[in-house]
Design a protein with these regions (language model features):
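Amphipathic alpha-helical hairpins
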Residues: 16-137
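N-terminal amphipathic/basic-hydrophobic helices that include classical n-h-c signal peptides
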Residues: 1-24
Length: 137
């Protein structure tokens, strides 16, 4: 549950940072506009990091190499996508399309493994890919 709690703090920070009334920065409260996609990206990144870490503890780590690599790539692009959406970047749609592509690859790889962490990651990647595709459309 610690992972979800950290997600809540990140989302609170995004909301606070984009809507603080006394901020001298340009007001770009894009968080509500992209809320479901940002949440999906952050949940996916969290699941990917957990999966990659757990895969390193598996007996046959060589068999998990592709999974670990895709988990790390997916987590990286998910964090980047969430950040760009929270900033209201004009590049957010393009990056979200790339994020969706990587999430689908990670979903496919993780689905091959029967471990709980891989199955959880596959589900999170599917949700994120679908949200990013909607956002990028």
């Amino acid at each position: 549950m610690l992972r979800i709690r950290s997600l809540d703090y990140i989302l609170y920070g995004l909301t606070f940072a984009t809507s603080h009334k006394n901020s001298k920065m340009k007001q770009t409260n894009n968080y509500p506009k992209y809320e479901s996609c940002i949440k999906a990206c952050l949940r996916c990144a969290d699941a990917c990091n957990h999966c990659a870490s757990s895969c390193t503890q598996e007996k046959d780590i060589k068999m998990m190499a592709r999974c670990i690599q895709l988990d790390m790539e997916c987590a990286t692009i998910c964090y980047a996508s969430a950040q760009l959406m929270s900033l209201g970047s004009e590049m957010a749609k393009a990056v979200c399309q790339i994020c969706a592509d990587i999430c689908w690859q990670c979903n496919e790889e993780c689905s091959k493994h029967q471990t709980d962490h891989c199955q959880e990651c596959a589900r999170a990647c599917k949700v994120c890919a679908e949200e990013c595709q909607k956002m990028a459309a």
